[in-house]
Amino acid sequence: MASMVLFSSSISASRPSPISRASVLVGPSRCHFGSPRSPATCKMIGPLKSSNGAAPCIPVIRDPGLLTGPPMQQRGREPDTRLRIFSGTANPALAQEIANYLGLELGKIKIKWFADGEIYVQLQESVRGCDVFLIQPTCPPANENLMELLIMIDACRRASARNITAVIPYFGYARADRKTQGRESIAAKLVANLITEAGANRVLACDLHSGQSMGYFDIPVDHVYGQVTNLIGDVKGKVAVMLDDMIDTAGTIAKGAALLHREGAREVYACCTHAVFSPPAIKRLSSGLFQEVIITNTIPVLEQQSFPQLTVLSVANLLGETIWRVHDDSSVSSIFQ
């Protein structure tokens, strides 16, 4: 069995992170994972709560009869002392959920910012000979979160970690994956090079914008994703479900929903993995076009971004199971079969 270290952070910072300035909506994921050779199912998310205890105005799937994924210890798996998880400042709530699923404590790490904006990272426990998993989406502010990830990787490499996996639930710059006109940069390839050169041995990402992004890395990439099963062309009188990898300003998906309503759709649902939610996304999504907007927590969702139609699902169990299988040298692809 390979050694693995999972770090999330007891974070010490000289300035508040973007997340600390507002309450983040969190909730338990409800998934079931079988053996490495059996498929996984994910059917439900538990009620959400805000970090300050207030009840957010976000509905959840309502069926208490659906299964809840048991902790690893209940399935005969004991935590491995060589597996460590660290979290950056971008999404510590998700990192904590992943650690809970794996039955681990987040690793101790110090992250702070100097007055000139430079980032300082120090691991506060040994990772020598360990499998280290660094959980840090490169969501907005993308440049700060990316640089923080690179410095975390470098710190682990210099501390003699055996393997370093960058767990990037949301991969920023993924849309810059090709040249659309002359003299443009392919930033997705550049970011892949930076992560590799910093010292990462592997990348774990959720629902990349395009499959070709995996080819930009010279190291193994585990791609966690969902898949469309069918498409119905005639929507008159039917329930329409719109799927996308991300919602940024929501302009495209709102126009699509308006078209579906004009074509006679009875209800329209929007589902996406990454909720970037740049203005005026919330205004468009809450305008009445959608019966429900279902997203995941690859990017932290702030309370001021909530609206009555919003449902947030957690990817913690899915990422946690993938992390364990990478560490255990088990099949990752069988999760999706």
Regions of interest found by a model, annotated:
Residues 1-337:
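PRPP-associated nucleotide enzymes
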